[in-house]
Design a protein with these regions (language model features):
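Formylglycine-dependent sulfatase
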Residues: 1-285
């Protein structure tokens, strides 16, 4: 593909699969993160509410409607978060002001508005994309973090030195990281990991609320649902915490659930390797 890394821009001559769905009669919409960056390509959405960054470290121009929401409610962004963990910290505000809570609520709102319009028979394709789970890991101090006991959490046994046993592409990747476990205490790391888990739990809760809207309008059984992520984090593997651009198990092994439009579908676990690139082709079929 002549693409050295994922940080690249789609040329205007390309056509997204959302655009193809739109051309074939679907109403297309997105709420949340897209990461098209500086590309000026037509994304192919009829409706857009894009929030590209992960608060609180993202440039303000990427946070758009989320910052507007905070301002409308008299919330100063810097008051919501205290940095006191490894690449993360403690959430100090009401959880309803967290960016992933905001995205989830807006996704639920879109779904409610769409399905309540019973006169509209046009098929739809909806992307709900959460900025998290992502550094900074900012949900320590919340009810979601309280679900996890530090004593029950695992501390990675692999270290930065273990990279020396691997190929050059792995031996060199550590130099690009700025976060090393050796610089922190075990408690600091476990709280950071708990905050990461808490972010996942918050997102799971918000997705559940959207699914309940589908069930409320008897649309769940007829809807294809794809749940996935773009990457994982090291979370202690090789003594690293965040992510890097490399082919490493903890970064690449992400969830990919597909619920077909089949009533009472029980599920099948497929162990074959699959790629996110297959999602577009699956949607087009």
């Amino acid at each position: 593909c002549q693409v050295p890394a994922y940080i690249s821009y789609l040329p205007d001559t390309e056509k997204t699969f959302m655009k193809r769905l739109k051309e074939n009669g679907y109403y297309t919409a997105v709420v949340g993160k897209q990461h098209f960056a500086e590309s000026t390509i037509d994304k192919g959405y009829d409706y857009e509410m894009i929030v590209d960054g992960h608060f609180p470290t993202a440039p303000k121009e990427q946070l758009g409607v989320y910052l507007d929401y905070l301002k409308e409610n008299g919330i100063e962004p810097d008051s919501l978060y205290e940095k006191n963990l490894i690449s993360g910290g403690t959430w100090k505000g009401d959880i309803k002001y967290h960016i992933d809570n905001f995205i989830g609520d807006k996704g639920k709102e879109w779904m409610e508005n769409r399905l309540s319009d019973t006169e509209n028979k046009q098929p739809w394709f909806f992307t709900l994309s959460f900025p998290g789970p992502h550094h900074p890991y900012d949900l320590e101090g919340t009810k979601y973090a309280d679900m996890y006991e530090l004593n029950d959490m695992e501390f990675s046994e692999s270290t930065y030195e273990d990279l020396e046993q691997k190929g050059p592409q792995f031996r060199n990747m550590g130099m690009y990281s700025q976060i090393y476990l050796k610089d922190y205490t075990k408690e600091q790391f476990l709280k950071t990991k708990r905050s990461y888990y808490a972010n996942i739990t918050l997102i799971d809760e918000k997705i559940g609320e959207v699914l309940e809207v589908l069930k409320k309008y008897n649309a769940y059984d007829d809807t294809v649902i794809i749940y996935t992520s773009d990457h994982g984090d090291f979370m202690g593997d090789y003594g690293l915490v965040e992510k890097l651009q490399c082919l490493e198990e903890s970064l690449m092994r992400v969830p990919l659930f597909v619920k077909p439009p089949i009533k009472d579908f029980e599920g099948v676990h497929i162990k074959d390797d699959v790629l996110n690139i297959d999602v577009a082709a699956t949607c087009m079929e």
